[in-house]
């Protein structure tokens, strides 16, 4: 009987021992699988970042904040294949909104990447401007884009009219291309197609008089652009497929393709519902016959000379909603190929249509012109 009790007593003790050992083993395994470590980048990555900082030491102006600098450096770091850029930040985040101080070596930024502190001293900060830098071996290659403050915009500033190569990266701060490539003589500008233009709002006269320009910029992000007036004014050779550009915020397309003699692309999918001004848009775009049937022009106020001298144009725009157009002066002047009837157009608000069909009466006879008021119709051939 005593022996029996002994066996009974030993059983739970043994079980407890086994459970305890198993629990300790699992705990040990957990500790082995999840060791506490402080991650640090390798020396090569740190050197890459330092090299970027050295290259960009004169690439900022007085309109930049400390955080602007960090954000821009992150873009260059990403291009270099550096990972986990959320770990690259200001050491003192309270300085994020501080603007840069004018002068040489007066801005000492302290960055950190993981637990590594990296000092960054800006060599030269100019007032509202960043200077353009050119390659020492090729005067037509820009290695640092210049830009300046112009009213409420930060404007790309390119003075050399024979450039053939630009940096891959467009600085984040630039939001205006006003006359940026005005008078450019080059046909191809290497890397221009790679720019992230998602911050750009103004394209006014960007390629004005760039007579040879024909670089493919079809992938540009134009989602924030509000003004496209004169973008390709007299850009005689330009003919690239820009039909996928996002034009949903654009309000002004006046003279956009004025004199763009070779341009002939399908623009049917453009969202133009917010455009108010299409005056002179295709004036003297002699080859243009791209489809624009689906355009919502219900907010357009002016179509003056829109297709004047567009001698190839003959697309069906008979169902356009022209109910808000006030002025149609010279709209189809000398547009000798256009033959569609415009009788369904709503022209109740039109008060001017002088020269509407000048030198084009044979194609746009009285049965095809819009139902103008008599006082307007009187001058359509003048």
Predicted regions and their residues:
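Negatively charged
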Residues: 2-382
